[in-house]
Structure formats: structure tokens, C-alpha cells
From Swiss-Prot:
Coiled coil: none annotated. InterPro entries: DiS_bond_form_DsbB/BdbC, Disulphide_bond_form_DsbB, DsbB, DsbB-like_sf. GO terms for cellular component: plasma membrane. It comes from Shewanella denitrificans (strain OS217 / ATCC BAA-1090 / DSM 15013). GO terms for biological process: protein folding. Required for disulfide bond formation in some periplasmic proteins. Acts by oxidizing the DsbA protein. This is Disulfide bond formation protein B. Belongs to the DsbB family. SUPFAM superfamilies: DsbB-like. Residues 1-13, 65-71, 164-175 are cytoplasmic. Gene3D superfamilies: DsbB-like. The chain crosses the membrane at residues 14-30, 49-64, 72-89, 145-163.
Amino acid sequence: MSKLVTFSQQRSAWLILMFSALGLEASALYFQYVMLLDPCVMCIYIRVAVLGLILAGLVGSIAPRFWIVRFLGMSLWGVSSAWGAKLSFELYQMQANPSPFSTCSFYPEFPTWMPLDAWMPSIFMPTGMCSDIPWTMMSLSMTQWTLIAFVGYSIAFLLFIYPGLLYKKPTNPYS
């Protein structure tokens, strides 16, 4: 347990979170602009959850020894990983059990104070259909891979929530 406490208070732990999520975001942009796979509105929402993980890693890496910074990072991490898993599962259900009554919107519904689709339409404007499964790897769709990734982030969050929020009194090497 003490190793988890120590690791959660190191900048490298938070940078691993940030760069792994950055890799997912880079993959999404590769699929969109190199492989020409159009993202659906649910894919855009999942992309926002990945950005939440990037932000969580960035916040946590600023000053990981301070409890309040770890708390903010852990909060962003928990919300983003759970929300991403929920969205990935909903999209998987739409693709696995297609129904004409269960479709997704063509336009994202971002809050008026944060219209990401207007600010950065090249990243946050959906152009695809939720029911399409344009890519698979090892018999799993992109949606299933994102679900696996978010479940992994959620499990890692659950492993780190308790040790990450424990207060560890700094030791004085001169005493």
C-alpha cells in the first residue's frame, strides 16, 4: 500500500495517465483524418471524456504532493473514466442491437458556455452515424476497444483513489 501512496504522489504517475490518454486522442484523430473514418456524436462525446483524462493527468502532474491537487486530478479522472465507459457501453448497445427508434443525434449538445463544436469543429463536429462499425481489430470494434480502455482507466482509478488521497507526511532527511 505504501508503494501505491508513494507512486500516486509522483509526477510520473500523472504523466502516464496524461500521455496514455493523449495517445488515445491521437489515435482518434488518426482514424478521422488519415483513415477517413467519420466520428459520430457519441464518438465526439467519448473524445471529450478522453480530454477529461488528459486534463486530469495534467492537473495531477502540476503538484502531485499537494492533497488538493491530487483530489482535483482524481475527481477529473474518476468522472471522465466512468463517463467514458458509460458512453462507450451505450454506443456498443446501439451498434450491437440496432433499432430505428434508437439513433443518435447529428449535432452534439454541448453547453452554451462551452460550445466545443463551434470552437473546434475539425475535432468536435460529428460527421458519421452511430450505427456504423467501420473498423475492427482482433474482431473487436473501435467502440469495444474504447470500452476496454475506459474500464481499464476506471479500474486504475479505483486502485489509486484510496492511496492517492491519503496524506503522507513528508519526512525530513535531516532529523
